Amino acid sequence: MKVKKGGGGAGTGAEHAPGASGPNVEPKPELQAESESGSESEPEAGPGPRPGPLQRKQPIGPEDVLGLQRITGDYLCSPEENIYKIDFVRFKIRDMDSGTVLFEIKKPPASERLPINPRDLDPNAGRFVRYQFTPAFLRLRQVGATVEFTVGDKPVNNFRMIERHYFRNQLLKSFDFHFGFCIPSSKNTCEHIYDFPALSEELINEMIRHPYETQSDSFYFVDDRLVMHNKADYSYSGTP
């Protein structure tokens, strides 16, 4: 299934061009505690960040995240809320103009993964990705991102992803994809088409000079209820 999205913006993916490196999956960096409305959180007694208004709101729906104007201060749902056991196992991006595969990564089957002690497992492992690109990625016009994912024994109705990209907390682009219905215990594949805008030279240079200040939130909904939230940041300098 191929999904076409309207508009353009800063896209995701990693470029396998000379001088570029693939994505490094790293633990989520410590994030500044801020409210999702864009204002800084007020001091609160006790350790830990103060939850923003969306973290206190349950359930969270698509309209809630479509109103965000800056990167969230933390994850808006826990891994346990993925009751449908949605698991992304393959990701590939290609330049739509040339057809060149820019990057491809595949998760090994469960039978080939090393055993992990549950006590040592980071609950946020796999929810944050750090990408490293060459500057040339910012000049691509259109990229296709193929995702392959499995679901558990529950039917998945109205599966939807909203992905919002920011540079220095300025919204660059919001993407909205509808996966539709997924039958239980199925493996699914679809390609999302990212149309990139023509960025100004000034903005391109700023994004290159300030690695990892380009960030994104990816929100996944089933029946208009948030069940997964992933984060990423991006460097376009071509170096770690």
Swiss-Prot record:
Annotated residues for binding of tetradecanoate: 131
Q: State its location(s).
A: Cytoplasm, Cytoskeleton, Microtubule organizing center, Centrosome; Cytoplasm, Cytoskeleton, Spindle; Cytoplasm, Cytoskeleton, Spindle pole
Coarsely, its chief localization is: cytoplasm
GO cellular component terms, semicolon-separated: centrosome; cytoplasm; intercellular bridge; spindle midzone; spindle pole
Keyword set for this entry? Cytoplasm, Cytoskeleton, Endocytosis, Lipid-binding, Phosphoprotein, Protein transport, Sensory transduction, Transport, Vision
Residues bearing PTM Phosphoserine:
37, 39, 41
**PTM:** Phosphorylation suppresses its interaction with KLHL18 and down-regulates its KLHL18-mediated degradation. Phosphorylated more under light conditions than dark conditions. Dephosphorylated by calcineurin.
Q: Does the keyword Cytoplasm apply?
A: yes
GO biological processes: endocytosis; lipoprotein transport; mitotic cytokinesis; negative regulation of caveolin-mediated endocytosis; negative regulation of clathrin-dependent endocytosis; nervous system development; visual perception
Alphabetically, the GO molecular function entries are: lipid binding
Keyword Kinase, does the record have it?
no
Q: So which domain of life are we looking at?
A: Eukaryota
Q: Which PANTHER family match?
A: PROTEIN UNC-119 HOMOLOG A, RETINAL PROTEIN 4
| Notes concerning its domains | Adopts an immunoglobulin-like beta-sandwich fold forming a hydrophobic cavity that captures N-terminally myristoylated target peptides. Phe residues within the hydrophobic beta sandwich are required for myristate binding.
The job of this chain, per UniProt, is described as: Involved in synaptic functions in photoreceptor cells, the signal transduction in immune cells as a Src family kinase activator, endosome recycling, the uptake of bacteria and endocytosis, protein trafficking in sensory neurons and as lipid-binding chaperone with specificity for a diverse subset of myristoylated proteins. Specifically binds the myristoyl moiety of a subset of N-terminally myristoylated proteins and is required for their localization. Binds myristoylated GNAT1 and is required for G-protein localization and trafficking in sensory neurons.
Annotated protein name in UniProt: Protein unc-119 homolog A
Q: Which organism is it from?
A: Bos taurus (Bovine)
Q: Print the organism lineage.
A: Eukaryota, Metazoa, Chordata, Craniata, Vertebrata
- What is the primary gene name for this protein? UNC119
